[in-house]
Structure formats: structure tokens, C-alpha cells
Amino acid sequence: MTEAMRSLEAAFLIGVEGVTEVWLVRHADCYEGMSEGADPKLSPLGRKQAELLANRVRKLDVAAIYSSPYRRALETARTIADDVHVDDRLIEMEMELGENGALDFKELPASVIERMSAAIDDIAQAHAGGRVIVVAHGAAMIVFLTHLLRLEPGHLRFLPYFTSVNVVRVLGDRQMVGTLGDTSHLE
């Protein structure tokens, strides 16, 4: 590898000692029988997705697993391992489905960014240099990833698929997106 390539990788926290690798994972499918305001359990498809994710993660050295307190996230995380840390800051963005079918967000993106950033920072600091799995929710993840990519809110036209892996590398106050939407475990 050339010196230029090593420098480029270091700039993106690839192969840098002490980097914490946070796997930000969207929960598995839960939409069978979901009603507005519900905290649904995983659907049969979601349980299969969670098991495929668990098979992938079990091959890795994982320092800890964190989850939103919502049932769909907890069930996904507990399919991987029994020992799951719950963090309320990982909850979904507050929203409702409007009359015209559009989403009506009840929580400002700045609030989501603040709580998600604080959660990821705290988790990364607690497991410095390790790999951590964080199971959360689609809209909150999009807002957080949009912020990390330095895009304006609404400019990341991407919906993480169920159990997709989004890798964020953290070192000190630096957070770099390494992977978006990896679903190779579902193939």
C-alpha cells in the first residue's frame, strides 16, 4: 500500500488504533399487524432477518450490544445476544402519518442529532477501540447519518432496510461513516 493510500485511510479512521466501530443497525421488520402508536413485535419475516443478522454478528468480536427500548429493536438485539444495554436516546423520531399520507415529524432534527450523537459518543467512549452493535430506528438513523455526512436535513434520500448495517467509526470527537445500508447477511 502506498503512503498516500495509508494517509487517506487514516483520514477516514480505517485501520487506526483505538477507533471504535459502531454498527448502527435498523431493527428487523415489524409491520405485520402494526397499528398507529403501537410498539409492535417483530413479524415472522423480521424474526428471520434478525436471525440472519445474529449469524453474521456472532462471527465477530463484539464488545457490547445496545438497543432502543422499543420492542422491535429489543427483539432484534436480543436475537444476537441476551446481554443488551438499553438506551432511551436511541428511540425513533417522533412522527405521525398525516391525512395526506405524508409523515408529520413531531421532533426537530436538531433534537434527534443531539441525542443520537450523545448516545453514540457515550457508547464509543465506554468501549473504546472495540466493536459495538447499536440497534435503533430508520428515521432517527437517517437524521443522524445525514448530519455525519454533513448534508442538509432531507438531502439523504436513503431508507435503511431492515437489519441493515451502517458503520460509524469513532475516535475522540471524530465520527466517520464507513458503510451505509449493508444487507449482505440477508442474501
Model-derived regions, located:
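Active-site signature of alpha/beta-hydrolase-fold catalytic machinery across serine-
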Residues: 79, 143-147
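Short beta-strand scaffold positions
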Residues: 67-68, 114, 135-136
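Phosphate-handling substructures
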Residues: 38-44, 78-122, 178-180
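Short active-site segment of divalent metal-dependent hydrolases/proteases
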Residues: 30, 140-141
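Active-site-proximal alpha-helix that buttresses catalytic centers in soluble enzyme cores
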Residues: 2-84, 108
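Domain-level recognition of soluble alpha/beta enzyme cores
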Residues: 152-176, 186
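Generic structural signal for well-ordered alpha-helical scaffold segments
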Residues: 51-58, 113, 117-125
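Generic beta-sheet signal
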Residues: 22, 122, 128-139
